[in-house]
Amino acid sequence: DGVALGSIIGQHYDGNFRYLVNDLLLNLPGLKPVSIGINKTGRNSRDFPRMVEAGFQSKNHMLMFPAGLNSRKRDDGTIHDIPWKKTFISKSVEYQRDVVPIHFGGQNSERFYRIARFSDKHLPFNLAMMFLVDEMYKNVGKHFRIAIGKPIPWQTFDKSKTATEWAQYVED
């Protein structure tokens, strides 16, 4: 989903975008120049806050995945994001950047969801992340529905709710 979104946003905005992504994905050809890597298993480098600040202060459109992880399959078989983190709200307000919600309609393989469930229950790290490239190649040539919502002005995120509550509001 991230690669497809980057392609669409990149074409529409002349390549002026950056991803905030798991740093493991920086090993994929072509992603490193357009990404700011987040270390999800250890500590971020001392340069990380500076890189994030530079990204948000630039003319680049920042692509963030508010859940921080891929969607998970629930016991009833439905696929849902885990609760969204508040970071996109706090960064929106801090850097006075509007939020444009995007919904990517697609799903990963049953194998991916089984690995994710096992990893979530039994491992201290996200093993499923290691299989994302495989999932991407399984979907080459397939069509997906991408819905791009109306921009939400950063001023919307006022003190009437906490950043976490605003994140839940945008997700809903």
Where are these regions (language model features)?
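Non-catalytic C-terminal accessory region of glycerolipid acyltransferases
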Residues: 46-172
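Catalytic core of membrane glycerolipid acyltransferases/transacylases, capturing the structured
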Residues: 1-43
